[in-house]
Amino acid sequence: MQTLVEQIVYISDMFGTAVFAFSGVLVAGRLRMDGFGVMVLAAVTAIGGGTIRDMILGATPVFWVRDPLYIWVVIATALIGMWMVKLPRRMPWYVLPVADAFGLALFTVIGAQKALNFGTSGLIAVLMGTMTGVAGGMIRDVLAREVPMVLQKEIYATACILGGILYTLSLEVGVDRVSAMLISMLGVFGLRVAAIYWHLSLPTFSLQRN
């Protein structure tokens, strides 16, 4: 039987899955894909990172095979998303980025904790948390023939890395798991929202040609 905290994390995980899936729907709509294309981009965005994480860790069957509700959430989000984008009234621009920041924070913590459950080091936990948060979006962008956002100057993967470090260090110094999750999520969410609001970005590397 799940504890209250585990239930809250599970419900939040489903919310994050829906948010990530909806971002895939928006990209597919911008590229004028058919219904199948919408489903594919929604799915890879929402569950791609966690799938790669589970395969690397040897956590098979992967999470959405063990719990098909993730797939149903993706399908429902894709169908609702295709209907919503046709509505005359648009949602405020900041709703999706802020919701995405929450999903990113949660996915980072879930990925890091799952790695720790498999006995990995803190470094690997940080990498797995980051992968859970960003790999799905990278696959989506590659399929859309775009440069993945995490490879540009956006503060996105950096926020995941920060969150993973905060989580593993908090556990290392004796902070309880719930508090460590909150500290990590606040770090990821706060940095990502600050980057959106103040247009913060990382310096870029440019090779000058003579």
Curated annotation (Swiss-Prot):
Give the UniProt subcellular location, in the record's own words: Cell membrane
Instruction: List UniProt keywords, sorted A-Z.
Output: Cell membrane, Membrane, Transmembrane, Transmembrane helix
Topology relative to the membrane: Multi-pass membrane protein
Where does the UniProt entry say this protein principally localizes?
membrane
InterPro entries in the record, alphabetically? Answer: Gly_transporter (IPR005115)
CC annotations in GO: plasma membrane
Where, by residue number, does the polypeptide cross the bilayer?
A: 8-28, 36-56, 68-88, 91-111, 119-139, 155-175
Pfam families tied to this protein? Gly_transporter
Give yes or no: UniProt keyword Transmembrane helix: yes
Family as reported in the entry's similarity comment: Belongs to the UPF0126 family.
Q: Which protein is depicted?
A: UPF0126 membrane protein
Source organism of this protein record:
Aeromonas caviae (Aeromonas punctata)
